[in-house]
C-alpha cells in the first residue's frame, strides 16, 4: 500500500490485556477508504475503549474513523439525527443538549463513538427500561469494498442491519448512523442511595424500581464473609426542570488505554480494596440519602473523577467478566458464585450490577435478567477462577459480554446463534475482509 496516511501503531486494549503493533490509517474522507486495495484485511475503529481488541489485530489494517465526526442531518419534528460514525457521545450530547434532546442509551465513557456503540450494541443506565443500542438505531450507512455503500434499516437490507448491530465491525465500515433522540427533561438527575447487604438485596431493589431512569449497584468483592456483597444501590430520575442552559462538562479529557496504564503496579488488591470500599460505602450510606448530579456526570461516570478507578489497576490492568443471568436463576447463581469466591479467594475487587430486558440475537449482550460485571485484579488466581466461573456460567444458560472478553468455547456454548452469525456473515462477505484480534480468537 502506498497511502501516506498509513503507519505502524502500537494498539492496547483498555483493560491492558492485548497489545499489538499493526498498520493504522486515520481516513478523513471517503476516498481514503475506497483506495485501499480490496485484498487488504481491515477493521474499523472508534475511540478504542473496548476491553478486548475488536478494532485491531496482527497484520490487520485498522481504519480509525474519529475524523468522521460531523452531524449531517436533523429532523426537529421526529427528533432524529444523522451523524457520522466517528462522533463521540460527548460531542453528540454537547450538540443535543442545546436542543433539549439526548440519546437515552449511553455507556459510561464519553469518548466512545457512535460507530462503536452500534458495533458493540452497548447498553445504558437502565437496560431493563430502555433496552440496548439497537433500539435507538434507525438506519446505517455501511461501506464494504465488495458491495460499495449500502443503506441498512429494519426495512432495507434488514439482514445486514441485524448483523451489523452488535457485529463488532465485521460487516464493514459504518459511515453514518440515523438515531432516535428523546426529549431531555432536565440538566440534572436526582439520585437516591440505598445500602444493600448482599447481591440479592440489589436484585430486590431493581425489581422494585424497573422504571427508573437510572438503576444500578456496586458491591464489595472481597472474599471475606464480613464484606462480600455489601454495597450501595442507586436509583436515579430526571429532575423536573432546567437550572442551567449550559452543559457542565469536565475540563480535562478522559483517559486512554495508554494513560490508564501509567502506574507500574496495581493499587487495588484483596487487602486494599476491602479497606477502600468499606470506607467508601460508609461515606455513601452515612451521607445524604438523595443528591443531584449534572447530566454529563450522570450519563458518564467514567468521564469525571470515577475515571481514576481504572488507573488504580496499574499497567497490568484489570480483568472484567460481565455476565447476564436470568431473573429466575439469579439467586441460585449468586449462591454458586459466593461458594467459588470463598474457595478460590481471587482478587475480586468490585461487582457492578443492573437489570436487563430484551431478546437475544446473534452475539448481542441482551436478554432478560441481571447483569453482573465482576472486576478482578489480573493474576494467575483470577485466571483459574474465571475458568471455573465459565463452567458455572454455562450450567445456568447465562450469556457473557464478548466485548469484555471471553474464550471461543464459552461463546460457542453461550450463544445459540453463534454458528448462524458466522454463516450469515460469510454469505454477505465470502472473502471475510473485515477481521480483528477478537474475531480471530473467537473463530468468527
Located regions from the model:
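Noncatalytic alpha-helical scaffold of FAD-dependent oxidoreductases
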Residues: 1-444
Amino acid at each position: 500500500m502506498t497511502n501516506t496516511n498509513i503507519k505502524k501503531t502500537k494498539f492496547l486494549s483498555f483493560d491492558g490485556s492485548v497489545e499489538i503493533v499493526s498498520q493504522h490509517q486515520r481516513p478523513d474522507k471517503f476516498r481514503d477508504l475506497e483506495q485501499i486495495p480490496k485484498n487488504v484485511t481491515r477493521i474499523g475503529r472508534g475511540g478504542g475503549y473496548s476491553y478486548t481488541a475488536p478494532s485491531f489485530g496482527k497484520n490487520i489494517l485498522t481504519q480509525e474513523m474519529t475524523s468522521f465526526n460531523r452531524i449531517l442531518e436533523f429532523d426537529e419534528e421526529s427528533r432524529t439525527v444523522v451523524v457520522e460514525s466517528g462522533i463521540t457521545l460527548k460531542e453528540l450530547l454537547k450538540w443535543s443538549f442545546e436542543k433539549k434532546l439526548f440519546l437515552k442509551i449511553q455507556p459510561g465513557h464519553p469518548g466512545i463513538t457512535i460507530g462503536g456503540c452500534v458495533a458493540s450494541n452497548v447498553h445504558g443506565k437502565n437496560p431493563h427500561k430502555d433496552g440496548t443500542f439497537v433500539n435507538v438505531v434507525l438506519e446505517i450507512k455501511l461501506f464494504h469494498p465488495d458491495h460499495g455503500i449500502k443503506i441498512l434499516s429494519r426495512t432495507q437490507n434488514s439482514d445486514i442491519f441485524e448483523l451489523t448491530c452488535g457485529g463488532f465491525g465485521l460487516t464493514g465500515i459504518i459511515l453514518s448512523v440515523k438515531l432516535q433522540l428523546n426529549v431531555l427533561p432536565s440538566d440534572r438527575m436526582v439520585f437516591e442511595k440505598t445500602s444493600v447487604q448482599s447481591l440479592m438485596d440489589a436484585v430486590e431493589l431493581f425489581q422494585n424500581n424497573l422504571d427508573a431512569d437510572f438503576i444500578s449497584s456496586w458491591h464489595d468483592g472481597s472474599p471475606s464473609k464480613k464484606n462480600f456483597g455489601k454495597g450501595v444501590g442507586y436509583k436515579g430520575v430526571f429532575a423536573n426542570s432546567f437550572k442551567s442552559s449550559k452543559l457542565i462538562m469536565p475540563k480535562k479529557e478522559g483517559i486512554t488505554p495508554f494513560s490508564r496504564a501509567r502506574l507500574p503496579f496495581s493499587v487495588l488488591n484483596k487487602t486494599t480494596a476491602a479497606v477502600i470500599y468499606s470506607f467508601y460505602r460508609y461515606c455513601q450510606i452515612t451521607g445524604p440519602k438523595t443528591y443531584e448530579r449534572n447530566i454529563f456526570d450522570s450519563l458518564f461516570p467514567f468521564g469525571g473523577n470515577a475515571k481514576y478507578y481504572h488507573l488504580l489497576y496499574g499497567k497490568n490492568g484489570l480483568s472484567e467478566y460481565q455476565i447476564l443471568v436470568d431473573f429466575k436463576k439469579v439467586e441460585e447463581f449468586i449462591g454458586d458464585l459466593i461458594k467459588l469466591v470463598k474457595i478460590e479467594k481471587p482478587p475480586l475487587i468490585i461487582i457492578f450490577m443492573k437489570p436487563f430486558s430484551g431478546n437475544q440475537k446473534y452475539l448481542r449482550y441482551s436478554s432478560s435478567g441481571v447483569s453482573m460485571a465482576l472486576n478482578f485484579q489480573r493474576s494467575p488466581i483470577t485466571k483459574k477462577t474465571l475458568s471455573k466461573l465459565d463452567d458455572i456460567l454455562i450450567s445456568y444458560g447465562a450469556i457473557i459480554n464478548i466485548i469484555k472478553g471471553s474464550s471461543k468455547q464459552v461463546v460457542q456454548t453461550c450463544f445459540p446463534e453463534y454458528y448462524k452469525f458466522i454463516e450469515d456473515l460469510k454469505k454477505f462477505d465470502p472473502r471475510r475482509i473485515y477481521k480483528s484480534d477478537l474475531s480471530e480468537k473467537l473463530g468468527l
